[in-house]
């Protein structure tokens, strides 16, 4: 639980806090809900190249429909976003193709979230909005004015935010929970850092800060930081040798254009199969050791502005560009522009760890806590989970039962056999909602039921202490870097699994092939 809680801090710590700075996420295009596929719908006659499909269907994803209207509206938003970033907008057909691919993946993620019982209510959206506004140092009303000034309705933004929260919680459960970093791996990593003093700065973090983190300030020193963008030419699972060869040829053509000096972000927007394609391929900034080994080998020695050779992974062919990098003197700055008012820059996954290296001991207030977790699912709604925990809390406060016994009986967390004991928790070890609820408790006090990305919790604080955590912080940072190194390929693998297991009828793609054959 502790590893998972720590690794998932990015939901509200980065993704949500940066959404205003990045402008409206493209998932706002989903503001028009999909209509259920009509029963008995028969495949329409093939339209002439200049005609629209008579049924208005752009794609079918399992049992869901993506309409042409959704694609058009999403394309308008994507075009506006690319223009804000200073990226050349692809031609209309290419843009719609890229947008539809994104909508298909978002629909698959939404279906998976529904299957796992992940839901986001209005109160959670309000909480996220308040947090975004607070971190951008504006009021929710001012934030709303900024959003609407950009041409996006408040209802669209709220829906987009709800979708992003839900999708992030899904990724946390489906991807992050399967990334396990052992103590032996941490030991080996730290030994390697000792042999490489420059890289070792990545694990020397400042003391964890109490609740509200502030926007990142330029550091005076730090580890090697790398800002990467990519173009991905995906190789579908089960592709034949001829298909792989054709995709390699396509990737080599894109690489040649990038090496020749064509704008990388524009190439990515028009051609990349990666989830960040419509952000110009931007993957964000991380310490060098936080990137996958393949990426480090290909781009670790490149200067800012340089492009790697072709990198082959299990998902296809990657072309990497070093957008920016910094050693110990100055932090890397994300290169894409973002509208006011926030100074932060967006990242596809999360910001890299803080790079400042403290001198001397790191003293923090640790909390010894335990909890009971009930996860939501198709058979356990939010209301049911909350009510069950309220009943347990009443029994605990009445003295009829012991907390550890209730945890062993009801908790769905890995700490259940230990009576829900989390041990000594450092600031920043848990997701912000959990930490905020825990920090509000006095010793021996039990919280009301509270919601985190994992489900509903009861938390009890046992005691607090001041403690020097220099070694623990170093190990925690090492574990985080190792986690981040695996997160990118793990996420791509998960997306590929979702795609390969689904029924996808991409009618725009079929129409394009038909037109090519008729030429």
UniProtKB/Swiss-Prot annotation:
HAMAP family in the record: Chaperone_SurA (MF_01183)
Listed InterPro entries: OMP_Chaperone_SurA (IPR050280), PPIase_dom_sf (IPR046357), PPIase_PpiC (IPR000297), PPIase_SurA (IPR023034), SurA_N (IPR015391), Trigger_fact/SurA_dom_sf (IPR027304)
Origin species: Bordetella pertussis (strain Tohama I / ATCC BAA-589 / NCTC 13251)
UniProt gene name: surA
Protein name per UniProt: Chaperone SurA
Biased composition (Low complexity): 31-45, 197-207
Matching Pfam families: Rotamase (PF00639), Rotamase_3 (PF13616), SurA_N (PF09312)
UniProt keyword Isomerase, yes or no: yes
Domain remarks in the Swiss-Prot or TrEMBL record: The PPIase activity resides only in the second parvulin domain. The N-terminal region and the C-terminal tail are necessary and sufficient for the chaperone activity of SurA. The PPIase activity is dispensable for SurA to function as a chaperone. The N-terminal region and the C-terminal tail are also required for porin recognition.
Chief location of this protein within or outside the cell: periplasm
